[in-house]
């Protein structure tokens, strides 16, 4: 089974945003990915963009089972049908996730703390990306 840890964030909310993704199998990291996604991005949009990229990357490694691990309670609950998707931009991203799910036999979503080992690594990737784009952190590493 493939596991993904994805994280999206912005500095300012909205503000400059980036995503970070870890793709793993049997405890081994297969891929690390980060990308700057725009100047005026909300945290929720960044979280969805990160999940979309995580699903795209996972589909390179498997068409079978994938577990997507996120620290965004909102995204998880929307995907599980516990929260409605009201915002038009989030709805568009939600529908993209739904379409990407068709690439897999089984998909599972798991909410974890931002302090989870691999979640922290995904967070570091996105924050390093923002640093590299010239958007310095409000706090020291």
Segments predicted by a language model, with ranges:
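Active-site proximal helix-loop segment of RNase H-like, two-metal nucleases, encompassing DDE(D)
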Residues: 128-130
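Short acidic DE-rich linear segments
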Residues: 139-141
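Loop-to-helix element that buttresses phosphate recognition and phosphoryl-transfer chemistry
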Residues: 46-50
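RNase H catalytic domain
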Residues: 5, 9-13, 52-125, 134-137
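RNase H-like nuclease fold core
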Residues: 1-45, 56-60
């Amino acid at each position: 089974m493939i596991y993904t840890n994805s994280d999206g964030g912005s500095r300012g909310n909205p503000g400059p945003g980036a995503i970070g993704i870890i793709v793993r199998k049997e405890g081994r990291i297969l891929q690390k990915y980060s990308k700057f996604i725009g100047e005026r991005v909300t945290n929720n949009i960044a979280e969805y963009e990160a999940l979309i990229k995580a699903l795209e990357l996972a589909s390179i490694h498997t068409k079978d089972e994938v577990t997507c691990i996120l620290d965004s309670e909102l995204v998880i609950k929307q995907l599980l049908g516990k929260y409605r998707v009201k915002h038009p931009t989030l709805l568009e991203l939600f529908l993209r996730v739904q379409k990407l799910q068709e690439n897999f036999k089984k998909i599972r979503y798991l909410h974890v703390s931002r302090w989870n080992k691999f979640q922290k690594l995904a967070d570091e990737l996105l924050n390093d990306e923002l640093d590299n784009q010239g958007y310095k952190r409000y706090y020291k590493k």
